[in-house]
Regions:
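Alpha-helical transmembrane-bundle signature of multi-pass membrane transport and export proteins
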Residues: 1-405
C-alpha cells in the first residue's frame, strides 16, 4: 500500500494520496455493483439477450453523451464536477437498492438505473482524466497511471466483485449499498483536493467546442489510430463479456458466490500488469508494448473460447488479457496526457472515450446474439478474430509513435 501511495513525481503528495484513495474506494464499490447487477438480472431472466441488455444500457451513454460531457468538463472545475457526479451516482444506486429490498421493479428498472449511472460516469471519467496531470508531473504519468490501474483492478476485481457476489447471495440489496457508501466517501476525498483543473471560459456554442476536440484528434494520426483501436477492442471485449455470467455458470457450473471469485481471479493479470507497466513501457517503449498487446490479447481470447473448460484454464487465459489491457491503458493514457493541450484535454479525451466506450453497447448486443446463435463460447472466438484483424490493419499507423514516449 505504501508503494502505491508514494508520489510518482511530486507536485502535491497530499493531493496524490487523496486522488488515488478516492479512485481505489470507488473502484471497490464499482466491483460490487458490476458483480451484483448481472446476478440481479439473472434472477429475472435467463435469456442471454436480455442479460446482455444490462451491459448495453449501462454503456449506451458513452455513445450518446461522451462528446457533450467532454465539452462540459472543460468548462467546469474538475474537482467540483467529479465530487458532484459521484454524489448523484450514490443517489441513483441507492434508489435501486431500495427497489431490490422492496422486491419491486424488474428488468426495465435495472436497465434504467444502469443507463443513468453510465450517463453520470461519462462526466466523471473525463473530469478524473483532467485532474491527474494537475497532481502529477509529466515525467511521472506512467507510474501514476499504473498505480491507479493497479488499485482499480485490485479493488474492483479482487475485492469488489467477490464481495458483491457474496453479499448478493446473502441479501440482494447489500452490494448496492456498498457502492453507495463508496461513492459518498470518494466524493468527500475528491472535494478535499487542494488543486484542481479549473474550467476554461468559452462563449462559443457547445457544438463548436466539441468540434474543436474532434478536429484536434482527427489531425493527430497516432492518437486517432489508437482511439479507433480502442473502439474495436472494447466492442470485442463486451461482445465476449456480456454473457460471461452465463458462460461461467453453465460451462463451469459455479454458484453465485463462486462466480465472484472467478471474476476476481481473472484480474490477477490486470493487477500485475499495472504494477509492472511503468517499468515495461520504460524498458521497451510505448510502441513496442502496445504492438505486443495487440496480438497477445486476441490470441488468448480465441484459445479461451476453444479450450477453457475449467477454472484454472479460464482464469489463466483471462489474466493474460487483463495483463495486456493494463499495459495498453497505461501506455496510451500517458501518451494522451503528455500530448494533448491542457485546455483541450476534456474534449479530446471525450472523443477518445466515445470511440472506445461508445462501441461497448453494440458489442454487448452482438454478444447476446452470437451466444444465442452459436453458444456461450462463440463470443470469445468471434471477439478474438475481430481484434486480430484490427491489429494487422493498424501496423503502419503505429510507426508514428514518438521514440521518446
Amino acid at each position: 500500500m505504501t508503494a502505491l501511495l508514494e508520489t510518482p513525481v511530486r507536485r502535491s503528495r497530499r493531493d496524490w494520496r487523496l486522488l488515488w484513495s478516492a479512485g481505489a474506494i470507488s473502484s471497490l464499490g464499482d466491483g460490487a455493483f458490476l458483480a451484483a447487477l448481472p446476478l440481479l438480472a439473472s434472477t429475472m431472466t435467463t435469456d442471454p439477450q436480455l442479460i446482455a441488455g444490462v451491459t448495453a444500457w449501462g454503456t449506451l451513454p458513452w455513445l450518446l453523451a461522451a462528446l457533450p460531457a467532454g465539452a462540459l468538463a472543460d468548462r467546469l472545475d474538475a474537482r467540483r464536477t467529479l465530487s458532484f457526479v459521484q454524489l448523484a451516482q450514490a443517489l441513483l444506486i441507492g434508489a435501486l437498492a431500495v427497489l431490490v429490498m422492496l422486491r419491486s421493479g424488474g428488468i426495465l428498472a435495472v436497465y434504467a438505473v444502469a443507463f443513468a449511472v453510465g450517463l453520470a460516469e461519462t462526466l466523471a471519467k473525463v473530469s478524473g482524466q483532467r485532474l491527474l496531470p494537475v497532481v502529477v508531473d509529466p515525467a511521472g504519468l506512467e507510474k501514476a497511471n499504473g498505480r491507479q490501474n493497479a488499485a482499480l483492478f485490485a479493488n474492483r476485481q479482487f475485492l469488489g466483485q467477490p464481495l458483491g457476489a457474496f453479499l448478493f447471495s446473502v441479501a440482494a440489496g447489500l452490494p448496492f449499498w456498498v457502492d453507495v457508501a463508496s461513492f459518498l466517501v470518494s466524493a468527500l476525498l475528491v472535494r478535499s483536493l487542494s488543486r484542481s483543473a479549473p474550467g476554461v471560459a468559452d462563449r462559443r456554442a457547445l457544438r463548436s467546442e466539441i468540434a474543436a476536440g474532434v478536429r484536434w484528434l482527427a489531425s493527430h494520426p497516432l492518437l486517432r489510430t489508437l482511439s479507433l483501436l480502442a473502439g474495436v477492442a472494447n466492442l470485442a471485449n463486451f461482445l465476449a463479456m456480456a454473457t460471461f455470467v452465463l458462460f461461467v455458470r453453465d460451462r463451469l457450473g459455479v454458484s453465485d458466490a463462486a462466480y465472484g471469485v472467478v471474476v476476481a481471479l481473472t484480474g490477477v493479470g490486470g493487477v500485475l500488469g499495472s504494477f509492472l507497466s511503468a517499468r515495461i513501457v520504460g524498458r521497451f517503449g510505448g510502441r513496442r508494448t502496445v504492438l505486443t498487446t495487440l496480438f497477445v490479447t486476441p490470441t488468448a481470447m480465441i484459445v479461451l473460447g476453444l479450450y477453457a473448460h475449467d477454472i484454472v484454464t479460464l482464469t489463466a487465459l483471462a489474466s493474460i488479457t487483463t495483463f495486456s489491457a493494463s499495459l495498453w491503458n497505461v501506455a496510451v493514457m500517458s501518451l494522451r496526457q503528455r500530448t494533448v493541450p491542457a485546455e483541450l484535454m476534456g474534449r479530446v479525451a471525450s472523443v477518445g472515450l466515445l470511440l472506445a466506450f461508445g462501441t461497448q453497447p453494440i458489442g454487448a448486443l452482438l454478444g447476446g446474439l452470437v451466444a444465442g446463435w452459436w453458444g456461450l463460447a462463440a463470443p470469445w472466438i468471434v471477439a478474438g478474430v475481430v481484434r486480430l484483424v484490427a491489429a494487422v490493419a493498424s501496423l503502419r499507423p503505429l510507426t508514428r509513435w514518438p521514440t521518446s514516449a
